[in-house]
From Swiss-Prot:
Pfam families xrefs: SRP1_TIP1 (PF00660)
One of the record's GO cellular component terms: fungal-type cell wall
Protein name (database record): Seripauperin-2
Location relative to the cell: Membrane
Gene: PAU2
Amino acid sequence: MVKLTSIAAGVAAIAATASATTTLAQSDERVNLVELGVYVSDIRAHLAQYYSFQAAHPTETYPIEVAEAVFNYGDFTTMLTGIAPDQVTRMITGVPWYSSRLKPAISSALSKDGIYTIAN
């Protein structure tokens, strides 16, 4: 006869090996923070390209928090809380390299964090 503690230990072992997943709305702040983290990293890696884009599109503005995060190499995630989801989407999808570079990186980062999104 199998002991209840053996069953519980087996269930706990299975649960520990399964990766946790969370399904969130695309506008959820946790999703936005992952997106903004990828965005800030991409700006740091391709700063000249972003400067050129900004020069060609002077009406495309960024919240000051994004600029501060780009040049602050410490933990910047707390700086980025509170940026409206529609503003996050506008910034990220507004650059020509969104589909080729940002979208795959964001998908990868969300997946790595066990986050899956659903439409709002």
